[in-house]
Amino acid sequence: MACSYILTPNPTKLNLSFAPSDLDAPSPSSSVSFTNTKPRRRKLSANSVSDTPNLLNFPNYPSPNPIIPEKDTSRWNPLQRAASAALDFAETALLRRERSKPLPKTVDPRHQISGNYAPVPEQSVKSSLSVDGKIPDCIDGVYLRNGANPLFEPVSGHHLFDGDGMVHAVKITNGDASYSCRFTETERLVQEKQLGSPIFPKAIGELHGHSGIARLMLFYARGLFGLLNHKNGTGVANAGLVYFHDRLLAMSEDDLPYQVRVTDNGDLETIGRFDFDGQLSSAMIAHPKIDPVTKELFALSYDVVKKPYLKYFKFSPEGEKSPDVEIPLASPTMMHDFAITENFVVIPDQQVVFKLSDMFLGKSPVKYDGEKISRFGILPRNAKDASEMVWVESPETFCFHLWNAWESPETDEVVVIGSCMTPADSIFNECDEQLNSVLSEIRLNLKTGKSTRRTIIPGSVQMNLEAGMVNRNLLGRKTRYAYLAIAEPWPKVSGFAKVDLSTGEVKNHFYGGKKYGGEPFFLPRGLESDGEDDGYIMSFVHDEESWESELHIVNAVTLELEATVKLPSRVPYGFHGTFVNSADMLNQA
């Protein structure tokens, strides 16, 4: 989400404890347990929302606590202290009002962060991990995966996408593996740790309806009195990871990227918010694309408040930014992903839009616009402005992710591969319809302005496929295979599918039993690779019976399990990953 807003409740910190008897997620009975083992029945305080009763109270299962510094307000003057007390009083009243109404499942923390979606504490490097099987000799570097991991317990609405960014890393050298996980120290998280409470708003979980407006007013009031500072960004950096310009970048579309450094022993340290030496002043979406031949990075930035609602830009391999190309849109549109070909960028303008005025009507600002016709914009990669943009309509098409795109000169078409999701806004707004994510081929004719769409997998073997990739060495070129998470039973991932994009043939790899994973990351075998699928699939897998997590390494040709790395602590289900080879690690800026 790209809502750059801020706010301030004041709850207790998470105890990060989980009971193995309640592991099924999402379920209200799934167990995330906090500092207290019994429900709190304290009287609400008039001056601190930290005394508000917890939303979640579950049995305690021993687990390390996060280290949170004592609240430091020593720099505040008497006026600021008085303002803080008054605003806390107002927020306590707001929370009382919110607690009188049930939360929809899409923002209820008892659903959103239960079971193995629940957060974990940081883990310092653990080396010489147990390995079943043999790690292929060609794997030399670090596999990293990003995810949402809230440090503080929610006091109100919370969506899975709202959590603080945490990167999990497995470093592999000569068949030996180590593991660590660390929060990305965003400006948001640093301030929250200083004040001992989540003072920034949750863009999806809290900013909706009249209470969302009230939270924004509280936030701006706190900023006015100098109780917080949002000028250095409000993002969580929890979604994407990319290695570019000698830097590992953690990203979410509500802020600039953050540079994270991998240390020699496999630990992680946040360097800071990265603006490409002052060239980048706006947020960047979490799915930039790197051309495997030119090594350029392509990106978008969208704004939900003011025009231009969308901008396109690129970076040279040396990190030099191009001028922004403003893309004309009638309204702010969710732009989570896009695609590139050898000569074009492919930009989806779909039916999930932002309408902030709906908050005054008590509604969510994220909505499905049934009157809008979805379309794709095809823009030359080196365009100086949007005058060369060709728009092709593709009705009723919503792809949260696009896996690849390429040009078909013989038919004057651009071919786009994506998972078409219905209902389009079901991730954000509660609905009764069953969610479907259908792998599709969308053909955009640049001469006629017409489009066609076909389902790639036959109906008899149709399944929800979300999160995955093609061989990134062929990004923007025609690919035969895609590796995609089997999101069943939704939202869990029971395995992954290797799909032949031409024939629709599907080969599945299931984790088995009560094991579930996430995004399958394809790692090419190396320069000596014999074919497009010559490589390995890497994915974190969690066993909901033993409550243990592993890294699985699967042969991408045969789909046979090559090695299993036993991890020292639980890895929650998360988002997107990357791999940094050992040579690049040595060259980090």
Curated annotation (Swiss-Prot):
Report the subcellular localization: Plastid, Chloroplast thylakoid membrane
Q: Which InterPro entries does the UniProt record give?
A: Carotenoid_Oase
UniProt enzyme class: oxidoreductase
Q: Origin, by domain of life?
A: Eukaryota
What does the entry's cofactor note say about binding and number? Binds 1 Fe(2+) ion per subunit.
Q: Name one GO cellular component term.
A: thylakoid
Q: Keywords in UniProt for this one?
A: Abscisic acid biosynthesis, Chloroplast, Dioxygenase, Iron, Membrane, Metal-binding, Oxidoreductase, Plastid, Thylakoid, Transit peptide
Region Disordered: list its residue ranges. Answer: 21-51
Q: Where are the transmembrane segments?
A: none
Provide the tissue specificity: Detected only in seeds.
Q: Does the keyword Chloroplast apply?
A: yes
Give each disulfide bond as a residue pair.
none
> Could you cite one Gene Ontology molecular function of this protein?
9-cis-epoxycarotenoid dioxygenase activity
Stretch forming the transit peptide: 1-45
Gene Ontology biological process terms in this record: abscisic acid biosynthetic process; response to water deprivation; seed dormancy process
Listed cofactors: Fe(2+)
- Signal peptide start-end: none
Q: Which residues bind Fe cation?
A: 287, 336, 401, 576
Relate the induction remark in this record: Low induction by drought stress.
Catalytic activity of the protein: a 9-cis-epoxycarotenoid + O2 = a 12'-apo-carotenal + 2-cis,4-trans-xanthoxin; 9-cis-violaxanthin + O2 = (3S,5R,6S)-5,6-epoxy-3-hydroxy-5,6-dihydro-12'-apo-beta-caroten-12'-al + 2-cis,4-trans-xanthoxin; 9'-cis-neoxanthin + O2 = (3S,5R,6R)-3,5-dihydroxy-6,7-didehydro-5,6-dihydro-12'-apo-beta-caroten-12'-al + 2-cis,4-trans-xanthoxin
Name the residue ranges with Low complexity bias: 21-34
What Enzyme Commission number(s) does the record list for this chain? 1.13.11.51
The family classification in the record reads:
Belongs to the carotenoid oxygenase family.
Protein role: Has a 11,12(11',12') 9-cis epoxycarotenoid cleavage activity. Catalyzes the first step of abscisic-acid biosynthesis from carotenoids.
Oligomeric state and interaction partners are given as: Interacts in vitro with VAR3.
| Name by which UniProt lists this protein | Probable 9-cis-epoxycarotenoid dioxygenase NCED5, chloroplastic
| Organism for this UniProt entry | Arabidopsis thaliana (Mouse-ear cress)
